[in-house]
């Protein structure tokens, strides 16, 4: 089984075209365990397999416990009617989930619609860390 950093590195090596530099908006390419733009801005894959694009930390009120409860609600069908509506439009599509939290909604959608490689962004490190589990 691959380590998280190895999974993250493999993803950026095959899907770097999904990303643009948040600083200068240039295209990015994989360079070892990082995404690098033409201007030299570098974003390293963390040990948890994630990328951190913000230029400073943002304090949020969202903690691990809140994201765990959110995951339970989604996994147990709270948004199933919405997932059912989205599924026909998402088949084999790339999805960008902005504000993905711990990633359970995108994961549920992928299980129903077989998505192309997709990406979730969130400002909460706790949510992203859970998403990478």
Positions of PLM-derived features:
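N-terminal auxiliary segments of SAM/dcSAM-dependent transferases
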Residues: 2-59
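Class I SAM-dependent methyltransferase Rossmann-like catalytic core
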Residues: 60-81
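Conserved alpha-helix/loop element of class I SAM-dependent methyltransferases that forms part
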Residues: 76-92
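Conserved class I S-adenosyl-L-methionine
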Residues: 92-101
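Conserved SAM-binding loop of SAM-dependent methyltransferases across substrates and taxa
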Residues: 102-114
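Short beta-strand element of Class I
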Residues: 116-119
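Conserved SAM/SAH-binding beta-strand->alpha-helix loop
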Residues: 122-126
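Conserved SAM-binding loop
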Residues: 131
